[in-house]
């Protein structure tokens, strides 16, 4: 099977040759870009000047006048703005958990170009929150949620705290944006929205590339869509979708509707040989323990190596997806000795390290 990224590299090098250095290739994540560069080196067979290989996040940041702020500084800024608006004595420790959730919501609001004023409408302009409209299960969930955040003592406090927060959400959102903008800082969604709004106004965006090629995207946000439409309309946007799995060709598959819409709205300039993949074979194995899962994965790898179905030198093409980060170390210690190099792309919480036990 020829990998999708290999076929992309092959097609573009065939058309552009050494001039490929004048192009920019945009991927949804860094890992895709690394493999693309690897395949491009294989295709060229000689040293060449590399094209720009970047992620959509990095490209947006490159085109925005704002500097991306780190998460901790962002939380502190939000906390100060919250205390100012709420006139509250809430501690930062108690704020961090749900403040991080609010930042996620603000990020989504901007990436999906939502009208924040309408979304964060004052709760008094909506129906009064009344337990009459909720099931007992919903009531219990609301109580548990707000109880964790504010530790209310009565049922009326649940409603009151909720109303008070909703009263300031829009001011909190705009206040945070204004504060960051005054410091020439921004969170990721704010950067996306800035670039998208400029694209929507057809402002000139200085791009030092003859073509900007988007590869391997799936679900795209509204801000990304507007930016991609802008590049398409000025003639430098090019798009390639890895939508060849049999399940995605099924017209009755609801996901296929959105995927086909992407292909229709953002067509490819170069024809890439479509490789229709076979339906994957899936085998389920019941394992009673977490460590046993790592051991079973090791046994499978060893069996593949022993039967010449897996070359240790090309093990990079084999993926092991763990259901829990706690399995990372048992898995790494169990890798067959024939495999000398692994690429790990998952986090490992501090609470599971030996340092946390000190």
Question: What are these model-predicted stretches?
Answer:
Residues 1-358:
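Nucleic acid-machinery interaction/catalytic patches
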């Amino acid at each position: 099977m020829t990998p999708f990224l290999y076929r992309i590299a092959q097609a573009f090098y065939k058309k552009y040759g050494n001039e490929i250095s004048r192009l920019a290739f945009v991927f949804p994540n860094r890992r895709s870009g690394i493999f693309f560069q690897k395949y491009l080196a294989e295709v060229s067979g000689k040293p060449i000047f590399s094209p720009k290989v970047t992620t959509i996040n990095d490209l947006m940041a490159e085109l925005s006048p704002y500097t991306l702020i780190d998460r901790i500084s962002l939380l502190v800024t939000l906390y100060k703005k919250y205390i100012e608006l709420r006139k509250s004595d809430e501690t930062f420790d108690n704020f961090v958990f749900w403040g991080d959730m609010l930042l996620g919501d603000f990020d989504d609001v901007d990436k999906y170009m939502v009208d924040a004023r309408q979304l964060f409408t004052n709760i008094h302009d909506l129906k009064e929150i009344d337990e009459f409209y909720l099931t007992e299960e919903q009531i219990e969930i609301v109580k548990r949620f707000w109880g964790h955040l504010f530790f209310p003592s009565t049922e009326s406090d649940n409603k009151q705290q909720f109303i008070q927060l909703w009263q300031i959400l829009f001011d909190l959102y705009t206040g945070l944006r204004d504060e960051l903008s005054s410091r020439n800082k921004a969170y990721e969604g704010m950067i996306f929205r800035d670039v998208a709004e400029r694209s929507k106004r057809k402002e000139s965006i200085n791009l030092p590339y003859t073509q900007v090629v988007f590869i391997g995207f799936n679900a795209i946000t509204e801000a990304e869509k507007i930016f991609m439409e802008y590049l398409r309309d000025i003639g430098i946007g090019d798009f390639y979708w890895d939508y060849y799995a049999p399940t995605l060709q099924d017209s009755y598959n609801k996901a296929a509707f959105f995927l086909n819409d992407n292909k229709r709205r953002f067509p490819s300039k170069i024809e890439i040989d479509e490789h229709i993949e076979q339906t994957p074979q899936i085998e389920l194995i019941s394992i009673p323990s977490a460590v046993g899962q790592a051991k079973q994965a090791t046994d499978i790898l060893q069996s593949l190596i022993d039967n010449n179905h897996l070359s240790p030198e090309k093990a990079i093409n084999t993926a092991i997806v763990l259901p829990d980060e706690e399995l990372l170390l048992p898995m790494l210690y169990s890798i067959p000795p024939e495999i000398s190099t692994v690429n790990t792309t998952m986090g490992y919480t501090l609470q599971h390290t030996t340092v946390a036990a000190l």
